[in-house]
């Protein structure tokens, strides 16, 4: 710390470079406290800036805590006392919030006496400006210096008005208007084409005239002199449109061949042919005829002249938007994030320097956290502040530049920050306090290869320095079933299927939760959901992994999108604006082209051309009147606008267009359209949004107040809060947290799954959505709005550089373990650059099943009783579930462990319950013979016998129930119908019903609420068979083959005791002649051998789906499972009452273990006794 303070005293600007995990926030806190303690600066003179609201709040809390602790430890220190008393005056803020604070709190200096109200972006204002421009384009284009033909070309690039608006909005949000303007100035060749277009049109038509003088055979011969002889349908005609001519020269095979190809050997052109060829080449050069390959590497012609005009008009519209927004800012004092920063810069640069001097007098030193993310305009602001004598401390990690969409760039950082700070004013932090030694070693090697071996311009280069581990983390690790795993693990599949890799990732998380433990600071505990974070490249990955995890019954923190951010809200909001008389139907064009009205583009054009928009306006006027008189609700008003069939039929008839008339007759409302398309989530959002808006309207009582309230709701959302909600994320300890890699920045996480399945060609600069290439060349950042092939390689390097940083940020969040999901994507490319296979201590094909061994039996658990109710389920309608679509537990065990049987049996048609094969000892005489018949007789009798009859003496019980027993013996096996067997069964059943079971402290005959032979069906996950091959190396013994269908089961008895629900199953297995043969050890061995532990989990799953809504209910209301081995109850039951109950096995499965896929997978593990 002394070294840092010394550098601060001796330099005007300091740079602290801190790699991930090296404690830059800790350093920043200590710098602040030491600046105060050493009297270098008072607390009022220090300004701390960062990027997000969340980081600001965390930093504020931590710094105040440090000040408080320092004061507590030295209360005699007057400086610390003063700092503690004034600690709330320490200004810690985001850069944008500080800029807004400066504009709003130095009003005399800025001469702006109204406070600005911030909002994230001018989305709706831009919509209105663009729609207004399109409506008034005829009168505006002259003022904007847009020619008629240029506007026509611009509009031709979109099918709908909505597309034009969206395109302009995206262009504004990219914030590259200045760059586009600068680029357009360099395109003088295209401007010259437009200036002499009439002359070029004449040249083209003259060529056509010359061709018309040739016969068809002569033209074909002319063509064949350039290629191998072939047939071609040659078509051309005169044109008066320079853009069509440019298109023709590109796409017409005849013309493009004559321009591009040389004549074949031994072929000689006639003077006439030579003239036409030369004229075409000259014309092609004059209109910049070029052929390019598109981003997807298919041959595709590009008409750059047309694209130039589109971009030219786009630029002029963007400048018009800027002008109109300035009016909006002036009239409403509402300002977006871009204008906040640009306004601050303009005031600081003003000649009077009033604002600059005011800030200088207030703050003497500024600490800027995450300085690598500064945009050029933000860097310029700090350079201006530096000129006023304010000291700057930049804290940065250039490897974490991941906000290119905020205009951060490594060249800005290197050129404008790092290279302008003296070497002796720089500090590099090296000790990683976050990650374990098992992670730091291989990560150093990975990023050394990625960064230090990269080919890049010096100004674009990022230097990687190895991190050093903190010894206190050396023994931190993840253990699965007693086996330690590597710090870095690669998850891959044998296929390149996205679905497979997501499913395998979800299953890995599932079993990590079931079998994994964390060892930290010599303590070991189970892995919890909050330990695991899944970091995704974007929203698409979040949606896919969320879907895969929920298939495995694992909850995530992904929530539904807030209604203010939905498309449904936007469209309803525009309709509401149409109901405001003051708006003068400004938003009508938008709603006409929106999906909520679904008006065909041809009809919109006819309405505009024939000036019939007034019909819709008149209709809405009538609705406004009804609304004002309270004769119609707001929802009904909106519904009338979106679906008034008579209105649309009337309008359609005016057009006399049969297709439009048919559309009007068959028009369905928005709800019907969503139902037809199966978009039920959108329907739910639409109805919820209507309900919320309706409630606000009911409170406000008029449309103007409603609009004002809704706009306030939008405006008052903090930019960072909106950004955090984009991925629909919230925190919950009972769920797996999913977030983007961008949102994970600055956080430490125990276990990280890193997901980026985006192919590199689909990334930012190569997508069709992005309108330009950005790259570094000749000492400066360049933009190419044509996206030319020759610039693609430079743009690729630029995007790859950012992807390296995103990968770095994601990988360095982990404390204990990192799981990298590898598929044919950017991640694969980066791992290749990292030379991953040359690095030790990395598990290259991580498979969770290598670590899953035999699972221990759960220990007996007792829970506090809570009130619950046993509700018998409705009977299963058996004909709904065909036999070929059901399986049983017995069929699963047969499939899993009897290969020969499996290979010769069609399990689609299985419908039997397997009985345990028992060794028979001929020398022993038993009253009740072994085999399945006795079991079936007992089960059938127990179903009919009324349990309460056992409260009486045995003789009376036998008298009341012997006929039932005799009937069942006769029915199942008449050879067993003897007096001895009847009496033995009666005695056994009586003993079972009158025995006080310790687990429930009651007798079965005393139970009042019970359900016998309860049937259940569990839906089989059809994806299981696919999941199996994801781990195929570990399934050699698993022969289960399940079709999409159901697993059926029948539970012998479900009952309520002590306010809990219990399951009881009768087992007639023969374990020996003596009662001691049914001790707990033998019972556990039998349970294990026969896989009964998996059977009772299936029973638990069956009733869980029927009786319990969630984990909380399961834990509170489920008492457990009792397996009652009936042969232990043949004689006197008094002998059972030993320290351990003979013949009774009890267990309470954990909620997470009651999972069908997990049970089936455990069946595949061969057990050894």
UniProtKB/Swiss-Prot annotation:
GO terms for molecular function: 3'-5' DNA helicase activity; ATP binding; ATP hydrolysis activity; DNA binding; exodeoxyribonuclease V activity; magnesium ion binding. Residues 1-436 form the UvrD-like helicase ATP-binding domain. Its EC number is 3.1.11.5, 5.6.2.4. GO terms for cellular component: cytosol; exodeoxyribonuclease V complex. Coiled coil: none annotated. Binds 1 Mg(2+) ion per subunit. The active site is at 1065 (for nuclease activity). Its cofactor is Mg(2+). It catalyses: Exonucleolytic cleavage (in the presence of ATP) in either 5'- to 3'- or 3'- to 5'-direction to yield 5'-phosphooligonucleotides; Couples ATP hydrolysis with the unwinding of duplex DNA by translocating in the 3'-5' direction; ATP + H2O = ADP + phosphate + H(+). Residues 1-839 are annotated as: DNA-binding and helicase activity, interacts with RecC. InterPro entries: DNA_helicase_UvrD-like_C, DNA_helicase_UvrD/REP, P-loop_NTPase, PDDEXK-like_dom_sf, PDDEXK_AddAB-type, RecB, Restrct_endonuc-II-like, UvrD-like_ATP-bd. The keyword DNA damage applies. Pfam families: AAA_19 (PF13245), PDDEXK_1 (PF12705), UvrD-helicase (PF00580), UvrD_C (PF13361). CDD domains: RecB_C-like. One of its GO terms (biological process) is double-strand break repair via homologous recombination. Residues 883-1169 are annotated as: Nuclease activity, interacts with RecD and RecA. Mg(2+) binds at residues 939, 1052, 1065. Keywords: ATP-binding, DNA damage, DNA repair, DNA-binding, Exonuclease, Helicase, Hydrolase, Isomerase, Magnesium, Metal-binding, Nuclease, Nucleotide-binding. Residues 459-746 form the UvrD-like helicase C-terminal domain. ATP binds at residues 18-25. The N-terminal DNA-binding domain is a ssDNA-dependent ATPase and has ATP-dependent 3'-5' helicase function. This domain interacts with RecC. The C-terminal domain has nuclease activity and interacts with RecD. It interacts with RecA, facilitating its loading onto ssDNA. In the RecBCD complex, RecB has a slow 3'-5' helicase, an exonuclease activity and loads RecA onto ssDNA, RecD has a fast 5'-3' helicase activity, while RecC stimulates the ATPase and processivity of the RecB helicase and contributes to recognition of the Chi site. Heterotrimer of RecB, RecC and RecD. All subunits contribute to DNA-binding. Interacts with RecA. Belongs to the helicase family. UvrD subfamily. A helicase/nuclease that prepares dsDNA breaks (DSB) for recombinational DNA repair. Binds to DSBs and unwinds DNA via a highly rapid and processive ATP-dependent bidirectional helicase activity. Unwinds dsDNA until it encounters a Chi (crossover hotspot instigator) sequence from the 3' direction. Cuts ssDNA a few nucleotides 3' to the Chi site. The properties and activities of the enzyme are changed at Chi. The Chi-altered holoenzyme produces a long 3'-ssDNA overhang and facilitates RecA-binding to the ssDNA for homologous DNA recombination and repair. This is RecBCD enzyme subunit RecB. It comes from Borreliella burgdorferi (strain ATCC 35210 / DSM 4680 / CIP 102532 / B31). The gene is recB.
């Amino acid at each position: 710390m002394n070294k840092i303070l010394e550098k601060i005293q001796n330099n005007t600007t300091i740079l602290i470079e801190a790699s991930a995990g090296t404690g830059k926030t800790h350093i920043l806190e200590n710098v602040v406290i030491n600046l105060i303690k050493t009297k270098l600066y008072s607390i009022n003179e220090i300004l701390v800036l960062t990027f997000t609201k969340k980081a600001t709040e965390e930093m504020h809390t931590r710094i105040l805590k440090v000040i408080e602790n320092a004061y507590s430890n030295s209360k005699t220190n007057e400086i610390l006392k003063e700092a503690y008393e004034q600690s709330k005056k320490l200004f810690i803020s985001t850069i944008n919030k500080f800029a807004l604070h400066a504009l709003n709190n130095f009003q005399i200096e800025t001469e702006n006496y109204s406070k600005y109200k911030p909002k994230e972006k001018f989305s709706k204002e831009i919509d209105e400006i663009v729609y207004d421009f399109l409506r008034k384009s005829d009168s505006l284009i002259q003022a904007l210096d847009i020619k008629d033909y240029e506007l026509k070309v611009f509009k031709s690039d979109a099918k709908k008005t909505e597309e034009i608006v969206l395109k302009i909005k995206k262009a504004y949000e990219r914030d590259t208007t200045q760059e586009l303007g600068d680029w357009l100035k360099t395109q003088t060749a295209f401007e010259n084409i437009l200036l002499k277009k009439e002359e070029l049109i004449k040249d083209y038509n003259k060529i056509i005239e010359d061709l018309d003088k040739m016969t068809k055979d002569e033209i074909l011969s002319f063509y064949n002199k350039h290629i191998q002889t072939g047939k071609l349908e040659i078509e051309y005609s005169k044109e008066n449109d320079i853009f069509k001519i440019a298109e023709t020269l590109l796409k017409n095979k005849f013309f493009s061949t004559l321009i591009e190809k040389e004549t074949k050997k031994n072929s000689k052109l006639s003077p006439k042919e030579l003239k036409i060829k030369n004229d075409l080449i000259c014309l092609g050069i004059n209109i910049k005829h070029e052929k390019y390959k598109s981003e997807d590497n298919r041959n595709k012609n590009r008409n750059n002249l047309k694209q130039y005009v589109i971009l030219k008009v786009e630029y002029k519209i963007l400048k018009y938007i800027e002008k109109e927004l300035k009016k909006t800012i002036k009239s409403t004092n509402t300002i977006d994030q871009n204008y906040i920063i640009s306004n601050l810069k303009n005031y600081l640069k003003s000649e009077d320097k009033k604002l600059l001097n005011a800030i200088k007098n207030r703050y003497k030193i500024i600490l800027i956290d995450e300085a690598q993310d500064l945009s050029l305009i933000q860097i310029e602001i700090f350079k201006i502040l530096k000129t006023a004598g304010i000291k700057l401390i930049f804290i940065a990690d250039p490897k974490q530049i991941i906000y290119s969409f905020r205009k951060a760039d490594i060249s800005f950082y290197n050129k404008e920050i790092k290279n302008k700070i003296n070497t002796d004013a720089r500090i590099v932090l090296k000790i990683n306090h976050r990650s374990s030694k098992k992670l730091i070693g291989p990560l150093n090697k990975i990023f050394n290869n990625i960064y230090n071996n990269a080919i890049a311009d010096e100004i674009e280069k990022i230097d990687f320095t190895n991190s050093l581990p903190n010894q206190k983390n050396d023994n931190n690790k993840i253990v699965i079933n007693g086996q330690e795993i590597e710090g870095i693990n690669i998850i891959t599949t044998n296929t390149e299927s996205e679905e497979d890799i997501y499913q395998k990732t979800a299953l890995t998380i599932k079993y990590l939760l079931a079998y994994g433990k964390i060892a930290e600071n010599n303590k070991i505990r189970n892995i919890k959901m909050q330990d695991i974070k899944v970091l995704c490249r974007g929203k698409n990955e979040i949606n896919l992994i969320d879907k895969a995890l929920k298939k495995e019954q694992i909850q995530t923190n992904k929530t539904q999108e807030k209604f203010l951010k939905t498309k449904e809200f936007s469209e309803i909001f525009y309709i509401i604006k149409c109901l405001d008389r003051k708006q003068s139907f400004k938003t009508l064009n938008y709603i006409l082209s929106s999906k909520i009205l679904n008006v065909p583009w041809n009809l919109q054009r006819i309405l505009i051309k024939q000036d019939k928009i007034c019909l819709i306006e008149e209709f809405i006027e009538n609705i406004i009147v009804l609304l004002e008189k309270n004769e119609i609700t707001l929802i009904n008003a909106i519904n009338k606008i979106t679906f008034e069939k008579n209105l649309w039929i009337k309008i359609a008839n005016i057009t006399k267009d049969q297709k439009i008339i048919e559309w009007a007759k068959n028009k369905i409302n928005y709800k019907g359209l969503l139902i037809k398309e199966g978009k039920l989530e959108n329907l739910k959002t639409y109805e919820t949004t209507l309900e919320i808006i309706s409630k606000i309207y009911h409170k406000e009582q008029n449309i103007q107040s409603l609009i004002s309230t809704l706009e306030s709701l939008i405006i008052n959302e903090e930019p960072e809060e909106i950004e955090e909600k984009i991925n629909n994320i919230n925190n919950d300890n009972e769920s797996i947290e999913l977030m983007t890699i961008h949102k994970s920045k600055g956080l430490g996480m125990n276990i990280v799954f890193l997901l980026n399945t985006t192919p590199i060609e689909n990334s930012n600069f190569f997508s069709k959505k992005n309108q330009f290439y950005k790259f570094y060349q000749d000492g400066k950042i360049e933009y190419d709005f044509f996206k030319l092939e020759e610039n693609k390689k430079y743009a690729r390097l630029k995007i790859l550089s950012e992807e390296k940083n995103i990968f770095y940020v994601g990988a360095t969040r982990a404390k204990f373990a990192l799981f990298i999901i590898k598929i044919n994507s950017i991640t694969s490319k980066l791992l290749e650059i990292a030379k991953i296979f040359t690095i030790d201590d990395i598990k290259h094909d991580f498979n969770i099943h290598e670590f899953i061994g035999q699972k221990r039996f759960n220990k007996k658990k007792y829970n506090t009783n809570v009130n619950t109710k046993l509700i018998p389920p409705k009977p299963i309608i058996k004909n709904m579930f065909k036999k070929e679509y059901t399986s049983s537990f017995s069929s699963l065990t047969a499939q899993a462990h009897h290969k020969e049987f499996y290979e010769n049996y069609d399990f689609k048609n299985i419908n039997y319950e397997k009985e345990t094969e028992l060794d028979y000892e001929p020398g022993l005489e038993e009253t009740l013979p072994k085999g399945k018949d006795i079991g079936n007789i007992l089960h059938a009798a127990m179903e009919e016998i009324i349990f309460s009859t056992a409260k009486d003496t045995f003789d009376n019980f036998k008298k009341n129930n012997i006929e039932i027993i005799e009937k069942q013996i006769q029915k199942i096996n008449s050879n067993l119908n003897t007096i001895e067997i009847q009496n033995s069964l009666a005695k056994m059943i009586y003993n079972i019903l009158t025995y006080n079971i310790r687990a429930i402290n009651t007798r079965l005959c005393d139970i009042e609420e019970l359900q016998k032979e309860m049937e259940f069906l569990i839906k089989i996950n059809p994806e299981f068979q696919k999941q199996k091959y994801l781990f195929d190396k570990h399934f050699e013994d698993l022969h289960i083959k399940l079709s999409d269908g159901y697993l059926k089961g029948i539970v012998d008895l479900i009952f309520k005791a002590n306010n809990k629900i219990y399951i009881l199953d009768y087992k007639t297995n023969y374990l020996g002649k003596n009662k001691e043969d049914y001790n707990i050890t033998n019972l556990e061995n039998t349970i294990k051998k026969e896989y009964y532990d998996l059977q009772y989990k299936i029973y638990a799953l069956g009733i869980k789906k029927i009786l319990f809504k969630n984990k909380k209910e399961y834990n509170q209301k489920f008492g457990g499972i009792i397996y009652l081995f009936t042969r232990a109850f043949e004689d006197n039951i008094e002998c059972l009452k030993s320290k351990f109950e003979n013949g009774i096995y009890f267990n309470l499965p954990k909620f997470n273990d009651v999972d069908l896929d997990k049970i089936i997978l455990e069946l595949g593990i061969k057990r050894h006794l």
